[in-house]
């Protein structure tokens, strides 16, 4: 596959919390779409090993959701650290998108970018500085055409790959209902 500057990199992280100064990344997944939002590649879905003290420091919400999904067990069993996750992810991305070409795509990607900047700087640097944030479209639709919101329901699994797939489907939905371009 030849890398294409028009392809889009979609990313989702699962973290132990919302504060990059104290919380850590525990899962990463990436997908690549063409400019028409067709999925053309799935990157590795990586649970990132964290010590038990990091996992024990998670709040109740994170303990519950990441426990029920099996992510905590996958993190404990994982042999991958953050540097290995970065290397594997970039090796995948290089097949589809040149460095610096794609905005960071997903839902609430500003939060993901904060964690990448702190713990996976090389991966954060792979993206263009711009974001394609589906949550921005959602906020606009909620205010300007709230009736459209009822046509798309998210599952909110808080599993990185499923969350990205849902973000792409959500943008496809908004594209069909809102954008006439």
Swiss-Prot record:
Coiled coil: none
Top-rank EC class of the record's enzyme: hydrolase
EC number: 3.1.15.-
Major place of residence: cytoplasm
Record's keyword annotation contains Ribonucleoprotein: no
SUPFAM superfamilies membership: Ribonuclease H-like (SSF53098)
Family: Belongs to the oligoribonuclease family.
GO cellular component, one term: cytoplasm
Active-site residue list: 129
Function: 3'-to-5' exoribonuclease specific for small oligoribonucleotides.
Localization of this protein: Cytoplasm
Domain Exonuclease: 8-171
Signal peptide residues on this chain, from the entry's feature table: none
Organism: Shewanella sp. (strain W3-18-1)
Entry-linked Gene3D superfamilies: Ribonuclease H-like superfamily/Ribonuclease H (3.30.420.10)
GO biological process, one term: DNA metabolic process
Domain of life: Bacteria
GO MF terms held by the record: 3'-5'-RNA exonuclease activity; nucleic acid binding
Stated name of the protein: Oligoribonuclease
Keyword field: Cytoplasm, Exonuclease, Hydrolase, Nuclease
């Amino acid at each position: 596959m030849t890398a294409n500057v028009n392809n889009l990199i979609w990313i989702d992280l699962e973290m132990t919390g919302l504060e990059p100064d104290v919380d850590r990344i525990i899962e990463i997944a990436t997908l690549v779409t063409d400019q028409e939002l067709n999925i053309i590649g799935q990157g590795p879905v990586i649970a990132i090993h964290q010590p038990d003290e990091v996992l024990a420091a998670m709040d109740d919400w994170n303990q519950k959701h990441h426990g029920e999904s099996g992510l905590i067990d996958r993190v404990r069993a994982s042999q991958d650290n953050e540097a290995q996750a970065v290397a594997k992810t970039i090796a995948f991305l290089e097949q589809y998108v040149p460095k610096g070409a794609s905005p960071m795509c997903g839902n609430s990607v500003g939060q993901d970018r904060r964690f990448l900047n702190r713990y996976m700087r090389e991966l954060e640097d792979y993206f263009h500085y711009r974001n394609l944030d589906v949550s921005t479209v959602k906020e606009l639709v909620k205010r300007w055409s709230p009736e459209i919101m009822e046509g798309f329901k998210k599952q909110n699994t808080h599993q990185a790959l499923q969350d990205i797939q849902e973000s792409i489907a959500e943008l496809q939905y908004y594209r069909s209902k809102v954008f006439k371009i």
